[in-house]
Amino acid sequence: MANFGLFITHRALPGQRDAVRAVWERFMRPAITENPAHVDYFYGFSADDADVIRVFQRYVDRDASQAFLNHPSYRAYLDEVTPLLAGSPDVSEVAVMWSKN
């Protein structure tokens, strides 16, 4: 079982969450879909904060997560999304011990 995961919280500038998602859809969704090292990926809006996006990613291993940071689509995503965010994301690494498949 792939056991490396990331919980990520992004905070968009007020009123910019949909714009952040549009950038994510353009660059990240296709890159993630085509990346076999992304085992699972969940992208969602916070139910209690209109500016927060929460993400869970599971990779085959930590090295694969680091390698994805050099993907051209990820670099383009960062260039366009950074001005829409209130700061750097909160990122927590986790060892996935179990998942329901």
Spans of features found by a protein language model:
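Glycine-rich beta-strand-turn "strand-cap" elements at beta-sheet edges
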Residues: 2, 42-51, 77-101
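Active-site-flanking beta-strand signature of metal-NTP-handling nucleotidyl enzymes
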Residues: 3-11
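Short, surface-exposed ligand-recognition loops at beta-strand->loop->(often short) alpha-helix junctions
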Residues: 11-21
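Short coil/turn motifs at secondary-structure junctions
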Residues: 13-15, 46-48, 60-62
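An amphipathic, aromatic/His-enriched active-site/gating alpha helix that lines ligand/cofactor pockets
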Residues: 26-39, 58-92
